[in-house]
């Protein structure tokens, strides 16, 4: 492990090209004028989104922050905004908190509930989600007879949820909605893919694990392949297991990516499959995450900074930061702490009778958050480089916001071809270019960045 030394570094600023979005001329804008304006805005946004491809890809948006910081409020705000802009939007709730129902003024079920023509909402429940994969396994087993009828006797409705199942099954359901690995199979009420999926998960920690799932699974797959190909037990059992997986994925007319392949080809395909998934979380055109904080709560602000660094460690990026308040701000928003992220704020006043989303969305005080949401879903923003290589000086610069130097550990394995960074209960592997591969000569922590010197 290399010790870290303090110094200073200036972060580059972020350049934005803001889009025209919904604005209000007066608080009393008539519904007819509002509808016409929204229609024009919607047309621009949807056309911009689809301009570069004939097959529109579903965007995935989520929010990260401390519990009670306003993640659910931000998710509902974003869902209402995108729906108002004419984008087919699905808000996915994966918790039992009734807050979303209050914010929407509607009950949420385990199948999509239509709030309006552009907005659907669904609550994920793991007890329901585990039934469909079990059904597919049973159908595959009926063809292959691997368990000799034992699997057929399993009653899915009596199975409880074990730790870890929530993240696994939510990822499977989100794959159907978004299509990280293959084309999305779950459609809106018009039979078309959704334009935007807004996800409000169980917790920020669970969401971060989900974000890093594909990249982290690749190393496990590598070791499993070695076990399958180099041991007697692996050579005996892996062909049957791989065939079972192949058959299960072919159920319901979904052609398996492993269809008809040999075991080595299936492992190669799995590696490419996982890389496709990992690249989707890195792609600003597909994935957006926003930090959410209560500006009146210093702990909420500190947590947002930490989750920024944790997202980088998970192998993804943060697109912006939101300050959500139910009343007027009583403290100064710490925008400087989040440079170079774009920062926006919104006030969502609660009443006993519910929320008037037309009034909230068209409030000029909330224009900055609408601008940021529209910008990121339509064109994306310039993102801070989290890893930079200087081959001339043999330097590796790792942007690690939210961490102190004592919280970062640096390791090196595999003959100097990569670095292993541990921070925020996440491990990240940095593959080094051939020009700077070698042993670590030193490291220092400089204004939210770890600068490693190679020799």
Swiss-Prot record:
Keyword Cell inner membrane: no
Catalytic reactions of this protein: ATP + H2O = ADP + phosphate + H(+)
Any Pfam family the entry gives: ArsA_HSP20
Sites where the protein binds ATP: 65-72, 182, 328
Single GO MF descriptor: protein homodimerization activity
GO biological process, one term: protein transmembrane transport
Protein name: ATPase GET3D, chloroplastic
Taxonomic placement: Eukaryota, Viridiplantae, Streptophyta, Embryophyta, Tracheophyta
């Amino acid at each position: 492990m290399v010790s870290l030394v303090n110094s200073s570094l200036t972060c580059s600023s972020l350049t934005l090209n803001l889009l025209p979005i919904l604005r209000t001329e007066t608080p009393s804008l008539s519904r007819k004028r509002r509808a016409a304006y929204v229609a024009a805005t919607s047309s621009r946004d949807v056309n911009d989104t689809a301009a570069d491809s004939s097959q529109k890809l579903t965007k995935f948006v989520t929010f990260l922050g401390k519990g009670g910081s306003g993640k659910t409020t931000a998710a509902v705000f974003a869902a209402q905004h995108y729906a108002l802009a004419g984008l087919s939007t699905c808000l996915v709730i994966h918790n039992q908190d009734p807050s979303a129902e209050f914010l929407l003024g509607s009950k949420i079920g385990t199948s999509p509930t239509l709030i309006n023509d552009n907005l659907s909402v669904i609550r994920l429940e793991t007890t329901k989600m585990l039934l469909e994969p079990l059904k597919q396994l049973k159908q595959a087993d009926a063809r292959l007879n691997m368990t000799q009828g034992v699997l057929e006797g399993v009653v899915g409705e009596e199975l409880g949820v074990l730790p870890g199942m929530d993240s696994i099954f939510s990822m499977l359901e989100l794959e159907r909605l978004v299509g990280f690995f293959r084309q999305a199979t779950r459609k809106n009420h018009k039979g078309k893919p959704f334009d935007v999926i807004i996800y409000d998960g169980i917790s920020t920690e669970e969401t971060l694990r989900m974000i890093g799932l594909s990249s982290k699974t690749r190393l496990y797959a590598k070791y499993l392949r070695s076990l399958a190909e180099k041991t007697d037990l692996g050579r005996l059992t892996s062909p049957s297991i791989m065939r079972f997986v192949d058959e299960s994925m072919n159920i319901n007319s979904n052609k398996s990516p492993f269809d008809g392949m040999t075991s080595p080809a299936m492992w190669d395909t799995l590696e490419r499959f996982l890389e496709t998934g990992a690249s989707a979380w890195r792609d600003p055109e597909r994935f957006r995450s926003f930090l959410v904080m209560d500006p009146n709560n210093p702990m909420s602000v500190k947590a947002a900074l930490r989750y920024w660094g944790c997202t980088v460690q998970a192998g993804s990026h943060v697109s912006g930061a939101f300050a959500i308040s139910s009343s007027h701000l009583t403290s100064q928003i710490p925008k400087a702490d989040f440079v170079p992220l774009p920062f926006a704020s919104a006030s969502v006043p609660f009443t006993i009778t519910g929320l008037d989303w037309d009034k909230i969305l068209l409030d000029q005080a909330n224009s900055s958050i609408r601008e940021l949401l529209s910008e990121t879903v339509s064109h994306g923003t310039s993102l801070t480089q989290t890893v930079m290589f200087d081959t001339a000086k043999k330097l590796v610069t790792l942007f690690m916001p939210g961490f102190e130097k004592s919280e970062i550990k640096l390791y090196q394995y595999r003959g100097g071809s990569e670095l292993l960074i541990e921070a925020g209960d996440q491990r990240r592997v940095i593959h080094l270019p051939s020009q700077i591969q070698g042993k670590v000569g030193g490291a220092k922590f400089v204004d939210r960045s770890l600068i490693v010197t190679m020799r």
